[in-house]
Amino acid sequence: MPDARQPAADEFSEIERLFRPLTGGVAGAFDLLDDAAVVPQRLGFDLVITKDAIVGGVHFPEGERPDLIARKLVRVNLSDLAAKAAEPFGCFLAVAWPGAFGPADRAGFAAGLGEDLRSFGMALLGGDTVSTPGPFTASLTALGWVPEGAMVRRAGAKAGDIVAVSGTVGDGGLGLAAVRGEIEDADGWLVGRYRLPTPRLDLRDILRGEASAAADVSDGLVADAGHIARASGLRLSLDLDRLPLSAPAVRWLAAQPDRGMALVRLATSGDDYEVIATFAGSVPAGFVRIGEVSTGAGVEVSAAGRDVPVARGGWRHL
């Protein structure tokens, strides 16, 4: 875990003080004193592993509170586990501290990390800390259990299935716009949705029992629908007039001159961390029908009663 380029005593003592308590005493973490951790097998279960990274100025604004950075890191990873119907239990952390990230900032990050790990029943099993001349960068590898063979993949949709999404769509993108001062957010609700998303772990049993395919909505609803379409070898048709919207999103939409393109913006802005899934038959509680699956390829989108071209389905890093 330590970076050899840093004073060993300082870093080891900081790991012991800030991060060792986050192991929760799990035996396989070895108090963060070893080169690796051990994850014992669990009879009748598959181990699900995911990894996401966040970078300052890309995934959160410069000057963000360190505890909120850590909590968002946990939650974006748990969103992947939620979409796979997995139950989280542990994680590995890699973090690159910039020079401006002082002892108080590192302590704040560790406090936020610990808060959410405890809330979601997870233990820190290991990781690495380094320094960087660039922006703050961190990644989390999250682990979860799912009954053997029960992970819900992107590949699994069938022609005739219903496409549905959980929660509300577009709040994360509007929250980012509010952070940038582009729109008003008087009560801070949209900004809260962007800064601290809620992973939909509550949908685990529904997804295991009823979903044929699923993905978390992180890049943008249209982009993530495209991931399912590609993996399943089928076409997903989305009717954006069916999008479930929050009250702030409804108010924003009503003020836009082109409803169709405004709906496209909501469906492509990302950072919602909801779940898009396909179902054979009725739509379960917690989801709203927004389209259907058919033979073909890609994603077709309609909004405001007309077909609309979508040049970019969501966020892309490259």
Task: Label every PLM stretch briefly.
Residues M1-P21, P98-L125, S131-A138, L143, ...:
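Glycine-/charge-enriched secondary-structure boundary and capping motifs
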Residues M1-L68, L93, G112-L117, G121:
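Extreme N-terminal cap/leader segments of soluble proteins
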Residues L47, I54, F89-A178:
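Glycine-rich anion-binding loops of enzyme active sites
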Residues G173-L190:
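Short, compositionally biased
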Residues T141-V152, A159, D185-I206:
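Active-site glycine-rich loop that binds ribose-phosphate moieties when present
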Residues P66-G90, A111-S119, I206, G220-A231:
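Small-aliphatic-rich amphipathic alpha-helix that forms the alpha element of a beta-alpha
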Residues K158-G167, L196-L221:
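Internal active-site segments that recognize and position negatively charged phosphoryl groups
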